[in-house]
Structure formats: structure tokens, C-alpha cells
């Protein structure tokens, strides 16, 4: 049962809209959260995912604000994080409310307009777009944005906490994200370093976390309104930085899992008080059916737990309608960038290796880069931004050059689609993810490097030796335990 501090309840009573009741707020805050997941459409369509998981006892209820999000009920207890489908990046375990900010960032109207302005089916809508996720870890929203962008354009994912950058990268790699650059900064620097650079920005701001009580009953046990004052000042500084980094005509989504006006509406109004008519609040009342139930007078979404039976959340859409003055002179460019553009001959040889070995075509909308004997694939829009700030990691590592030929990297196999794979059974996939070699019943001619897959989606690379598949899974990805569904 949730532990409520009386000061917190008094604060909620002040901010709760008149059409909602405290009784419902307390009742829903004490209910366990429904399990929710998001299908990773970089790897599988949600229809195919439903077809794959329904025989395994999954029941799906669509989440109205995310076309790839579902509340799920399972007919058997299983550690979802240890299932093969999770480890190969077919889905992300993500709270339903947290799927709202990326949806608001690329609401259907804007995607439709982008599609109308292209000659094809709109699949390249984002090819020249530059997007920033200011506070990214652990990566649920980052990977959702990447999927909405169809791995096109450039997504800069920033994380201030050094320990969380590693987790962020692991999730980005698992989900097959190829258009991402990771940075590790206090996000207050973006307004200075990347002034008017981004088409879209998500600021999922650090907050008091009041909306997460259904996940953590002790979250508000020691709640103190005075603790929020420092957080609010940080939030104001971050939203100012985000607005400065936004292009004219661009859109910013500000979100928190806090419930108070102080951390939400007041922060947005602070921005408007600074920049006046350059700040335009966009209405999210029609973002999805019944969005108006959570809509404020400004058009923000203030999601209370009882409205959609979810975590509490706040989402605001803000447009930059005119230029604003730069606060500081442009910083000097960073030097000593360790990568260089690959030469045309190097690119062709590498592309030939991927075609011949795995039937993989390297994407046209990316740039092959070289560092020592390593070959990387960078999203093309990052090239003009090199030197503006330091990057922890850009794009994906494709392969290492050997004395003869190349050695493909695991993350390249997960991010680049290939029709030619060596399909594994449940038990074989389990063995592979536990780092073991796979014995083959029928001996054949050695085939060298092969992509092994499960449910037609890649798991990694093995070396086909004729009588077995030698496991090439990176050691840090080897698992002690894999959860398999029992067959009824």
C-alpha cells in the first residue's frame, strides 16, 4: 500500500482539477500498475509481434496514445526481461504514460505533412531531421523516438549521469538503433553549444517523481514541498536551454512524471514570460481519443492516475515561432576528433563484404567513418555537427579490419536488416544467448560467418564450422539465465 505524506495529499488537493476526486486519486495510486510494453517496429511490425506472442499466452490491449504500445496480460509467470524476444530487442517494457512524450513530439499531423512533402511513401520523412532527447537514460523514450524516425536523420541522446550512459547505450544497441549519437553533458549546455540546431527536442525533465507512486509505494513517504524548489530551478534552466537549442519553427516537448503545477505548468509559463510571442503552446487535446479528459486550459496534458489507469504524467508541446537572441558567443570548436571519412575504395570493399557475407546493403543515408582499424556507420546529419561538442559514441560499429577481410560487429547485425539467416529453435536460441556453441544434427560444408536468428529476427553472429555453430556473442551480452515459455 502506498505511503502518503499528509503534506503531499494537501498539495494534490490544491492542484487536482475540480472534476476529479481525491478518493479516486488515492484508490488508483494504491492499485498495481498494468504491465505495458512497446513493440520495436525497427525490427518487427506490431501485427507480426502479436501473431508471434499470442500462442505464448499474451493478451493485448492497445494503448490509445501509442500505436505500438499495449497493456499485456500473460497466462504464465515469466521474467520478461530474460525472454529471447526481449533480449533480441523485439519489445521494450515501458510504462504506458511514458509513451506519451514521443507521441506528442511527432504527432500524426506533422508526420502526415512530412509524408505529403515527399515523393515516396513518407519513409524518409526524417532523413534530414535533427532531434534531441535531453535526458535519455535508460532509453525507453529514446528508442521510441528512433522507431518513429524509422532510423532516419539524427537523434542525439544525452544523459548527465555517467553510470546511466552505459545502460542507455545497451538499450539503444539492443533495439537496433542506428541513427543515434550519445552525449554526456549537463543538458543546460545545449542552448550554448547547439544554438537553434534541432528540429525537435524532448525534455523529459528530472522531477520529484510523484506520478511513480504506483511503481514505488514508498516514493512519497518523506515528501517535502521545499525539496522541489531546487528541482524547479533546474527544470527552468533546462527548458530555457532547450528553447535556445531549438530551430525557429521547431517543436519542444516538456514532460515530467511529477503531478504539481509548480514543476509543470509553471515551468512552461516561465519560458513564455522570458520569450513572449516566440513561445507558442500547442494543444494536445486531439492527440488521441479522449485526450481532452487530461487537457489543461493551455492545451497541456496533465495525466492523473485515475484518468487512464496509468502513472501520473505531464506533457506540454511548445513551438518556437521566431528567432531569439543568443545568450553567449559561439564556443570554439572541439579538436582532435578521432574519426575520418572512409575513402571510396574502403567503402566499396566493406559494402562488398556485407553483401557477399550477409546479403546486407549498407544504407545510403549514412556515412562510413574510420578510426584505426575500425569501421563505423554515422548518420549523415551528424557530419556538420562534428566539433560543436564531444560525443560519447556515434552511430554503430560495423566491422574491424583484419589482415585479410573483416570481422562484423554484433551491433551492426542487430541494426541492419538481412534476409539471409540461420534460424534457431527455442532451445538453440537459449543456448546461443548463454554463450554456448550450437551442435548441428546434419554435418555440412563450413559456411564461415553466419547471422543466427530466432523468429526471423537476428540474435547475433556465429561461425559455421560444418558440425557446429561457434558462438561469437560478445561476452558482456552472455546471460546466465534465459526464460522460455512452457508449451501447453
Swiss-Prot record:
Might you report a single GO cellular component term? cytoplasm
Binding-site list for S-adenosyl-L-methionine: 135-141, 159, 186, 204
Q: Does the keyword Kinase apply?
A: no
Q: Which residues form the active site?
A: 257
Q: Recorded GO terms, molecular function? A: RNA binding; rRNA (cytosine-C5-)-methyltransferase activity
Q: Where in the cell is it found?
A: Cytoplasm
InterPro entries, A to Z: Methyltr_RsmF_N, MeTrfase_RsmB-F_NOP2_cat, MeTrfase_RsmB-F_NOP2_dom, Nol1_Nop2_Fmu_2, Nop2p, RCMT, rRNA_ssu_MeTfrase_F, SAM-dependent_MTases_sf
State the UniProt keywords alphabetically: Cytoplasm, Methyltransferase, RNA-binding, rRNA processing, S-adenosyl-L-methionine, Transferase
EC? Answer: 2.1.1.178
Q: Which reaction does it catalyse?
A: cytidine(1407) in 16S rRNA + S-adenosyl-L-methionine = 5-methylcytidine(1407) in 16S rRNA + S-adenosyl-L-homocysteine + H(+)
Enumerate the Gene Ontology biological process terms.
rRNA base methylation
Q: Which HAMAP family match?
A: 16SrRNA_methyltr_F
The family this protein is said to belong to? Belongs to the class I-like SAM-binding methyltransferase superfamily. RsmB/NOP family.
Function, as annotated: Specifically methylates the cytosine at position 1407 (m5C1407) of 16S rRNA.
Name listed for the protein in its UniProt record: Ribosomal RNA small subunit methyltransferase F
Protein source organism:
Shewanella pealeana (strain ATCC 700345 / ANG-SQ1)
Amino acid at each position: 500500500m502506498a505511503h502518503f505524506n499528509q503534506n503531499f495529499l494537501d498539495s494534490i488537493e490544491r492542484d487536482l482539477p475540480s472534476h476529479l476526486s481525491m478518493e479516486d486519486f488515492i484508490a488508483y495510486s494504491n492499485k498495481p500498475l498494468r504491465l505495458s510494453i512497446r513493440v520495436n517496429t525497427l525490427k518487427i511490425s506490431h501485427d507480426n509481434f502479436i501473431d508471434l506472442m499470442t500462442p505464448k499466452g499474451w493478451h493485448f490491449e492497445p494503448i490509445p496514445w501509442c500505436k505500438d504500445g499495449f497493456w499485456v496480460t500473460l497466462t504464465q509467470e515469466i521474467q520478461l526481461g530474460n525472454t529471447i524476444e526481449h533480449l533480441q530487442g523485439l519489445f521494450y517494457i515501458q510504462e504506458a504514460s511514458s509513451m506519451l512524450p514521443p507521441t506528442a513530439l511527432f504527432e500524426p499531423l506533422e508526420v502526415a505533412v512530412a509524408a505529403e512533402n515527399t515523393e515516396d511513401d513518407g519513409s524518409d520523412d526524417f532523413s534530414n531531421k535533427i532531434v534531441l532527447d535531453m535526458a535519455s537514460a535508460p532509453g525507453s523514450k529514446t528508442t521510441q523516438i528512433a522507431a518513429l524516425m524509422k532510423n532516419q536523420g539524427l537523434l542525439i541522446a544525452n544523459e548527465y549521469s555517467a553510470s546511466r550512459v552505459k545502460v542507455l547505450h545497451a538499450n539503444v544497441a539492443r533495439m537496433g538503433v542506428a541513427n543515434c549519437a550519445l552525449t554526456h553533458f549537463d543538458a543546460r549546455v545545449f542552448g550554448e553549444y547547439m544554438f537553434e540546431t534541432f528540429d525537435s527536442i524532448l525534455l523529459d525533465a528530472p522531477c520529484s517523481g510523484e506520478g511513480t507512486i504506483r511503481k514505488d509505494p514508498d516514493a512519497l513517504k518523506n515528501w517535502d514541498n521545499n525539496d522541489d524548489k531546487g528541482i524547479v530551478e533546474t527544470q527552468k534552466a533546462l527548458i530555457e536551454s532547450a528553447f535556445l537549442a531549438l530551430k525557429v519553427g521547431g517543436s519542444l516537448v516538456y514532460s515530467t512524471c511529477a503531478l504539481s503545477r509548480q514543476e509543470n505548468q509553471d515551468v512552461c509559463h516561465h519560458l513564455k514570460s522570458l520569450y513572449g510571442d516566440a513561445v507558442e503552446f500547442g494543444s494536445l487535446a486531439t492527440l488521441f481519443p479522449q485526450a481532452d479528459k487530461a487537457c489543461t486550459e493551455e492545451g497541456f496534458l496533465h495525466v492523473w492516475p485515475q484518468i487512464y489507469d496509468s502513472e501520473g504524467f505531464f506533457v506540454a508541446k511548445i513551438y518556437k515561432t521566431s528567432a531569439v537572441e543568443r545568450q553567449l558567443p559561439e564556443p570554439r570548436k572541439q579538436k582532435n576528433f578521432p574519426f575520418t571519412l572512409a575513402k571510396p575504395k574502403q567503402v566499396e570493399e566493406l559494402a562488398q563484404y556485407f553483401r557477399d557475407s550477409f546479403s546486407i546493403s549498407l544504407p545510403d543515408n549514412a556515412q562510413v567513418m574510420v578510426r584505426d582499424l575500425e569501421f563505423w556507420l554515422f548518420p549523415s546529419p551528424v557530419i556538420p555537427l562534428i566539433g560543436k561538442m564531444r560525443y560519447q559514441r556515434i552511430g554503430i560499429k560495423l566491422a574491424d579490419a583484419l589482415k585479410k577481410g573483416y570481422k562484423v560487429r554484433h551491433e551492426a547485425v542487430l541494426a541492419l536488416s538481412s534476409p539471409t539467416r540461420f534460424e534457431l529453435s527455442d532451445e538453440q536460441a537459449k543456448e546461443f544467448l548463454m554463450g554456448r556453441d550450437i551442435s548441428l544434427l546434419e554435418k555440412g560444408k563450413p559456411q564461415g560467418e553466419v547471422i543466427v536468428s530466432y523468429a526471423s529476427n537476428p540474435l547475433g553472429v556465429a561461425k559455421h564450422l560444418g558440425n557446429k555453430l561457434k558462438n561469437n556473442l560478445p561476452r558482456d551480452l552472455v546471460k546466465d539465465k534465459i526464460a522460455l515459455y512452457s508449451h501447453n
